[in-house]
Amino acid sequence: MPLIWAALALAIGVPIAAAAGSEQLAWRGPIYILAGFAGIIALGLVLVQPLLIGGYLPGLSAYRGRRAHHWIGGALVIAVVIHVAGLWITSPPDMIDALTFASPTPFSPFGVIAMWAIFAVALLALLRRRLGLRLRTWRIIHLPLAIVIVAGGVLHCLLIEGTMETISKAVLCAAVLAATVKVMADLWRKRTLRGESIARR
């Protein structure tokens, strides 16, 4: 197995395994636990997305990478819905406070903002052809929303003191940020080189 696949599996698998061994689970109900792990998986999927679109995962062609990016995006939406629905079932007042930005917890607004950005990207992806969005326009819209998703998701995760183990959580968040910065830098470099090539003609 190529090292990058092994590193990806560890970056996502270790935090999940560490959370599964948390003593705090003893005081949590099954729905709350499901919601929590859906949140961890969602952050793991956020890590996969830039790796796919940047073509960094060996064995995947550009076409397969884009297709996988779309499917992982759908899985991310499902994970977020399970996360939010589970928390709503276990504590409706807390979720109402979070969704209305009235929660006293510092991590709530970042999670809510990231959630709406994820839903916005998913909706636009579904309606892209109907709206007649060109690839360039789609990227202009998608990139800022992706940044919001990454920043909001990472801050939401880091500020929560829950079942996730501190070090593995920090490593996962750092990996998400690093992958996002890497793909953005590479895309910017490609556009710059393409612009220079066109200007020379």
Residue locations for each model-derived region?
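Membrane-embedded alpha-helical bundles that constitute the cytochrome b-like, heme-associated redox core
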Residues: 1-201
